[in-house]
């Protein structure tokens, strides 16, 4: 049985957000770095640092929280893994789903790399739907 690194980073970020942790440490791979770059560019993550520990690289993410009048912090990050090792989900460029009418994003793995649904629609390419973020 293989290791699902995408599900691991989604779970780590979701758990840290629910527990109001400011920082998350995830293992650095090419896929995780691509996904984290998208999260940083879309504004879901404030800052990213690369950390080396015993010949292993880790990414340290600083999560963005929004203030609420009733609570000190309100969680806002919802992530859902779609395609998984046991059930791959693919979509062409016309059938890429829109999350909350375009407010959320879909992260796809395409032949031209990992990108958001907007980029894939502009380039008119489809791919494997990795996760939804809203």
Swiss-Prot record:
InterPro entries in alphabetical order: Ribosomal_uS8, Ribosomal_uS8_CS, Ribosomal_uS8_sf
Its protein name is: Small ribosomal subunit protein uS8c
What does the entry list under GO cellular component? chloroplast; ribonucleoprotein complex; ribosome
| Subunit comment | Part of the 30S ribosomal subunit.
Q: Could you tell me one molecular function GO term of this UniProt entry?
A: rRNA binding
Compartment(s): Plastid, Chloroplast
Top-rank lineage group of the source organism: Eukaryota
Keywords, alphabetical: Chloroplast, Plastid, Ribonucleoprotein, Ribosomal protein, RNA-binding, rRNA-binding
For this chain, the family text in UniProt reads: Belongs to the universal ribosomal protein uS8 family.
Record function comment: One of the primary rRNA binding proteins, it binds directly to 16S rRNA central domain where it helps coordinate assembly of the platform of the 30S subunit.
Q: Name one GO biological process term.
A: translation
Chief place where the protein resides: plastid
């Amino acid at each position: 049985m293989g290791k699902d690194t995408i599900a691991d980073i989604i779970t780590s970020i979701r758990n840290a957000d629910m527990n109001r942790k400011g920082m998350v440490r995830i293992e650095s791979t090419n896929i995780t770095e691509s996904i984290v770059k998208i999260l940083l560019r879309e504004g879901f993550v404030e800052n990213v640092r690369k950390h080396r520990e015993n010949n292993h690289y880790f990414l340290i993410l600083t999560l963005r929280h929004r203030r609420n009048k009733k609570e000190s912090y309100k969680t806002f990050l919802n992530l859902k893994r779609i395609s998984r090792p046991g059930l791959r989900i693919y979509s062409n460029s016309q059938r890429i789903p829109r999350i909350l009418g375009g407010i959320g994003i879909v992260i796809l793995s395409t032949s031209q790399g990992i990108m958001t649904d907007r980029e894939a629609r502009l380039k008119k390419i489809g791919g494997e739907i990795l996760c939804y973020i809203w």
